[in-house]
């Protein structure tokens, strides 16, 4: 099962908007995840955000580039950036996203 976590072992049920960019050479790329009102920011949540973990049967992809957005002093969203520096990292990310998309009803559209 493909899951996104902000704290190890705690799945985030909010499905993000994901934007992809890729170098013309194909050797590097960036995925930007935007979560509106994720449950990790709920007042009842006591878990710390330690990164973003993309977990599936192949293992785990990790980024520490996670930022919160605050409006009037209250957390409203989380943005995470995953940088891929090789074709292998890109391919691994795409395999994760295919699984995650199937499980969460996501589609893909080219900009």
Swiss-Prot record:
GO terms for cellular component: photosystem II oxygen evolving complex; plasma membrane-derived thylakoid membrane. Keywords: Membrane, Photosynthesis, Photosystem II, Thylakoid. Pfam families: Psb28. One of its GO terms (biological process) is photosynthesis. Coiled coil: none annotated. It is found in: Cellular thylakoid membrane. It is a peripheral membrane protein. Transmembrane segments: none annotated. It comes from the Bacteria. NCBIfam families: PS_II_psb28 (TIGR03047). HAMAP family: PSII_Psb28. Part of the photosystem II complex. This is Photosystem II reaction center Psb28 protein. The lineage of its organism: Bacteria, Bacillati, Cyanobacteriota, Cyanophyceae, Oscillatoriophycideae. The gene is psb28.
